[in-house]
Each structure stands twice: as C-alpha cells, then as structure tokens.
C-alpha cells in the first residue's frame, strides 16, 4: 500500500464530517502533502461556543481565522489586511476584528461571540471593532473546486451542513513535536482521542465534484489547424462566466479515460498570439498540439483567465516594466502586490472529467501543476516535459522559473554551458 493510500485509509467520510459540523461539533481537515500538509480544526462559525474555541486554542496555534464568502466580507466591510499580499498560498487575510460588545476580545467567550456575529446575516460593519482577535479570511468563489485550501473547505463544509457559509479554522500543533505541526498519523490519533472526524480536502473536492458541476459544456465543433484537425469543445464557468475551450484529438474517453496526453495551457496573449520572445508559452502550446496530434489522442485545455499566471494582461505588462528595470518574474509580481502564481486548476480538472479523462500523461515542465490537478480528483500517470528554445530574450525568465518556481528546464543548463559569460 502506498503512503497516499495508507493516509487515505485513516480518513473518515465527508458525509460523517458534514453531519458533525451540522451538529455543532468540530472536525479536522488535512490538505495535500505537497501543499501545507497540515490539519486544521474546523467548525461552523454560526455554532461557535466558548468550549469549541477553548478546545481549538488548547490544541492549535491559537491563530483563529474565520473564512467567509467574498459577499459577506464585502458586506461587513472587511478589506485586505495588506495591500501587498505575499502569502505563499494566497490566503486572503482581512483586517482583524472583535465584536464591539464584550471585554478584551481575547477570551474564548469573546471570540466565540465574534465568530457567531461574523456568521450573522443581520450583522454589519458597526458591530465590530478593528483591529481585534479574530482573523476573517476571504474564501474563493467556487470553494475547494477552485482553490484547494482550508479557507474554502471551511465555507464548503458549513454550507453543505445547511448552515451559514462561514467557518472557523486553526492549525493543529504537534504534541509529539511541539516545534512543528501535526501530520496525518498523529492527526488520526488526535481525532480518535477527542472523538473527531478526520477528512482531507481531496475527499471534499471529490465529494463536491460528484455532487456539483461548476462548468457547463456549451458547444462542440470541428477545428482544422496547422497541426491537424481537432474537435473544439466550448465551456462556460458557472462561477464567473469565463469562456473556456478544450482542443481534443481522438476518443479520450476510450480505455476508461486512462493515460490521456493532456496539456493544461494558461492563456498568454503575448506569447500565444503575438509570438513574444519573453516567454516560452507559445512554444509550449504549439509543441503540445503537435504531440497530441501525433499521438492521435489527447486534450489541450486552454485556460482563459490565467493570463500572467493569473494576474491579468495589464498587470503582466506592468510586471514586464519592472523586469525591464531588473526585477525577475517573481519579484515583479510581488512588487505589484500580486502573488507569484495566482492560478487554480479546479476548472480544468472538471473539464477533463467531463470529457471522460480519468488519468493523464501531463505535458508540462511545471511539477506544481501536477499537485494542482491531482488535488482536484484527476490522477497523473506520468509527465512529459517540453523542450524549450532558450535565447537571450527569455533566458532570465526561464532561469527564474527553474530556480524559484521549480520548473524542470534542462535546456537552460545547456544554454548556460554554451554561454558561460551570461
């Protein structure tokens, strides 16, 4: 049995966790081992009690956060904690708050009151003081199907339990090693000791994927290209209306949808359309289409809305300005107050699943993309790297992708050997 299977065998069912949330109990939710690999105590903000808060503080870091929908965060006038969010996971912290009635705000009783108030649909901004001792978080619309984080998991669980979409989360600290965080084996023992259910975000994603659809297939047509004839399948996101397209060769649902050659390609107007030499996006798109046509079976999912690794076209051009002044592609984004990579792959996973794909040979130089897709119910059988043409216009960008973002780019090392002066 693999480590992944062993960990999964120690988990309870999503249905059991939802039932406990509805009953006012806490559960523990663990995320992907390649993400934070941490377990959070989670319960519904609407049903917060001093006892639940005291338990959370006793066994966690004590940094209690309250995930809310973006709509509720706006209604309560909860702006971002900082204009320049540099959190590695893109966690959307807002200003901290306390209920405006109570004592110091730090006690379990006061924090439970603040949490219930955050979940109250009748509450408004005047019911809170700022700063405080509870940290609201803004959850992504679409929940764990869009972002596989504890923030979204808490909101999804509360909603699935028939409660207000507001949760309470805090990371479980290891009792066996108080300097670190608890991992799955210890979390299982912790949950057994305290009669708590333990589930994973991966399970919750799978549960939601089976029960909900966030993309709709709209149209299907033949698409002749310079690389051969494909089928173009158009989709629309139910969340924000973004129009997406899958370029399909052959019968990808045959053989159980196993080991399908797939490229999940992030939109890049400058590289894909204008042939920009600052990036390798156009090269990767064209090579992927060629490989798939050659194989006779595969998919390119073209992810609109991923421009500039998710920051948008104009922001990407502003980042280019900063790169012209010496910043690399990561620092340029951060200097603009934007994440180095804001992309999420839940929508692409749903498109692949709708097409009948169950496991895939991923065409990518980015190992992190594997984690993003696997966390959304798609299994990665293998990964096919794409050779890139390295030249003076893109070498700095490619070096940053290799050195700071973990991309697999052996062609860069070859270029460095041939150009030691650079």
UniProtKB/Swiss-Prot annotation:
GO BP annotation list: riboflavin biosynthetic process
Pathways per UniProt: Cofactor biosynthesis; riboflavin biosynthesis; 2-hydroxy-3-oxobutyl phosphate from D-ribulose 5-phosphate: step 1/1; Cofactor biosynthesis; riboflavin biosynthesis; 5-amino-6-(D-ribitylamino)uracil from GTP: step 1/4
Binding-site residues, GTP: 263-267, 284, 307-309, 329, 364, 369
Domain of life: Bacteria
Entry annotation: catalytic residues: 341, 343
SUPFAM superfamilies for the chain: RibA-like, YrdC/RibB
Residues where Zn(2+) binds: 268, 279, 281
Known cofactor(s): Mg(2+); Mn(2+); Zn(2+)
Keyword Disulfide bond: no
Gene Ontology cellular-component terms listed: cytosol
Region (DHBP synthase), start-end ranges: 1-210
GO molecular function: 3,4-dihydroxy-2-butanone-4-phosphate synthase activity; GTP binding; GTP cyclohydrolase II activity; magnesium ion binding; manganese ion binding; zinc ion binding
Pfam families membership: DHBP_synthase, GTP_cyclohydro2
Chain residues that bind Mg(2+) 1: 36
Region: GTP cyclohydrolase II, residue numbers: 211-422
Residues annotated as binding Mg(2+) 2: 36, 150
Chemical reaction(s) catalysed: D-ribulose 5-phosphate = (2S)-2-hydroxy-3-oxobutyl phosphate + formate + H(+); GTP + 4 H2O = 2,5-diamino-6-hydroxy-4-(5-phosphoribosylamino)-pyrimidine + formate + 2 phosphate + 3 H(+)
Feature type site, description Essential for DHBP synthase activity: 133, 171
The protein's Enzyme Commission number: 4.1.99.12, 3.5.4.25
Protein function: Catalyzes the conversion of D-ribulose 5-phosphate to formate and 3,4-dihydroxy-2-butanone 4-phosphate.
Stated name of the protein: Riboflavin biosynthesis protein RibBA
